Swiss-Prot record:
HAMAP family given in the database record: ARENA_Z (MF_04087)
Region entry Disordered, spans: 1-26
Organism: Chapare mammarenavirus (isolate Human/Bolivia/810419/2003)
Oligomer and partners: Interacts with protein NP; this interaction probably directs the encapsidated genome to budding sites. Interacts (via RING domain) with polymerase L; this interaction inhibits viral transcription and replication, Z partially blocks the product exit tunnel for the releasing nascent RNA product. Interacts with the glycoprotein complex; this interaction plays a role in virion budding. Interacts with host eIF4E; this interaction results in eIF4E reduced affinity for its substrate, the 5'-m7 G cap structure.
Protein name: RING finger protein Z
Entries under InterPro entries matching the protein: RING_finger_Z_arenaviridae (IPR024183), Z_RING-type_Znf_sf (IPR038485), Z_RING_Znf (IPR003224)
Composition-biased stretches (Basic and acidic residues): 1-10
Amino acid sequence: MGNTKTKDRQYQSNSSQPTNTSAPVLLRRQAEPSLYGRHNCRCCWFADTNLVNCSNHYLCLKCLNTMLRRSNLCDICGEELPTTIIVPVEPSAPLPGQ
C-alpha cells in the first residue's frame, strides 16, 4: 500500500549510481621518507613497499584489493578507493656512465 513508493525510490537510487571516475594513482615502490619515519600501509601496518596513496594515507596492494572486493570506499577514511594505478618504469640496471 504505502510501501510501493519507497520501493520505487530504492530502485531509482540503485540505477543512478555514479560511475568510477577516479584519477590514476602512482604506485610507489618505496614511500617518500618523512620527518616522522617510514610510511607503512595504514590497514595492515606491515607493508612498506608498493604503496598506493589513498586520500591522506597509504595502502599496500593486498589491502587495496581486499577493500575493493567489499566496496569502492576506503574502510579507513571513507573516500573513494583508487582503481587506476600508474606503475613507473624504473631501470633494472644502472645507466651507462654512472
